[in-house]
């Protein structure tokens, strides 16, 4: 087996992931943590190679790790431990890794593939695996090569765009969002539309205000489901203690502005007051407001509509959404239905995980199923 990589540094995306500590899996990862235009495609692979399988491999290499939160597992030392693990396993399996190399052409011949390398001899193989990743973070060499090659082999490509990416806001009526960089608030964000595109989802996580818009885990998660032109719905109250939150005996003497300042960071309270003040008498005491106005205010805070202008693109994205259409692949082997000698795995396929180690788990699981299928063909 030969691995060809155009990068000067091997496994660079692993190296930079998780702030340099590699969120190598999520111990709670399962089918519900993935999206695809072909829902359920990833289920088989995810059941065949579970987080506990990779955790066992990590432990066998005596790599210390810890859970950060919500099942996310990180190396105690650095991402280099995971890279070292993969290189050691490759050596054990007599895998040759050649990099940096430039692929000039890949041609299907009668019984094999011929891979021409710029300035080097060509290679031939009976099975070809495309594990090129997506287009996120082009600075480390990400490109559309895998997509272009798959298309050239007759496979359909679902539209791709940046995923797990911050959102931008440019309209004047939402300018307040960009005027409080650094402010963070735990919120619930609802996004998408059931039965359309990648469906609908809701995430209760932190949102971070930036000078361009919104970031933070809740926003990155929501970005996977968001479509251009859609609004997102923010529940600003979701993480607050709900008992007696609107008990008039407790809050009746306070104005809406004062309540906002009590519930939220000062700059966020000011921004919300600016937006709400266009429609409601926010300087009046809560007890002085009529029932209908109170209900409208509560509803507005629980389903606050924001319409992103866009996202911050591939340079700021963590993953690619979309990719090789899974209807052209066998879910048990990741084998192309157009050519039984071609396999496509990992991020190049239209399977995208949630934030928190799930995309690595898809990489491990899809690679495992592919490897088992190829191994079975070579069994005596």
Which residue ranges define each predicted feature?
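A conserved FAD-binding loop/helix module that cradles the flavin
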Residues: 134-153, 351-380
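A conserved short coil-to-beta-strand element within the FAD-binding core of flavoproteins
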Residues: 99-113, 165
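A glycine-rich dinucleotide-binding beta-alpha-beta segment and adjacent secondary-structure elements
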Residues: 99, 274-352
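Short beta-strand to alpha-helix junction loop
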Residues: 42-50, 69-88, 98, 137-142, ...
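An anion/pyrophosphate-binding glycine-rich loop and adjacent beta-alpha core
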Residues: 8-10, 15-16, 25-31, 64, ...
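Glycine-rich active-site loop/strand segments that organize a redox cofactor
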Residues: 19-69
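Short hydrophobic core segments
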Residues: 2-4, 103, 122-142, 150-151, ...
């Amino acid at each position: 087996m030969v691995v060809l990589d155009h990068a000067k540094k091997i496994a660079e995306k692993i190296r930079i992931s998780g702030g340099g500590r590699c969120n190598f899996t999520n111990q709670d990862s399962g089918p519900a943590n993935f999206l695809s235009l072909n829902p359920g495609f990833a289920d088989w692979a995810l059941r065949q190679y579970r987080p506990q399988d990779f955790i066992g491999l990590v432990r066998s290499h005596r790599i210390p790790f810890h859970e950060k939160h919500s099942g996310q597992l990180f190396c105690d030392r650095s991402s280099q431990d995971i890279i070292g693990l993969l290189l050691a396993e490759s050596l054990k399996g007599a895998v040759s890794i050649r990099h940096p190399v430039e692929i000039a052409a890949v041609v299907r011949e009668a019984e094999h593939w011929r891979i021409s390398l710029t300035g080097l001899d060509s290679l031939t193989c009976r099975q070809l695996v495309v594990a090129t990743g997506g287009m996120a973070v082009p600075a480390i060499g990400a490109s559309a090569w895998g997509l272009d090659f798959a298309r050239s082999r007759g496979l359909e490509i679902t539209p791709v765009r940046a995923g797990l990416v911050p959102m931008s806001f440019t309209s004047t009526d939402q300018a307040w969002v960009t005027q409080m960089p650094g402010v963070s608030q735990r919120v619930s964000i609802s996004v998408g539309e059931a039965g359309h595109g990648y469906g609908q989802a809701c995430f209760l996580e932190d949102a971070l205000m930036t000078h361009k818009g919104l970031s933070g885990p809740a926003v990155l998660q929501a970005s996977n489901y968001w479509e251009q032109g859609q609004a997102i719905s923010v529940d600003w109250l979701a993480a607050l203690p709900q008992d007696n939150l609107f008990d008039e005996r407790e809050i009746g003497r306070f104005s809406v502005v004062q309540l906002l300042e009590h519930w939220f960071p000062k700059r966020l309270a000011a921004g919300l007051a600016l937006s709400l003040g266009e429609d409601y008498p926010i300087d009046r005491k809560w007890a002085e407001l009529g029932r209908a106005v109170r209900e409208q205010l509560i509803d507005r805070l629980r389903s606050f509509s924001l319409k992103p202008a866009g996202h911050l693109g591939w340079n700021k994205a963590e993953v690619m959404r979309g990719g090789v259409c899974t209807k052209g692949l066998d879910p048990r082997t990741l084998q192309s239905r157009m050519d039984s000698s071609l396999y496509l795995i990992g991020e190049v396929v239209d399977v995208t995980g949630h934030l928190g180690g799930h995309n690595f788990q898809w990489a491990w699981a899809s690679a495992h199923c592919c490897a088992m299928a190829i191994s079975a063909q070579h069994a005596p």
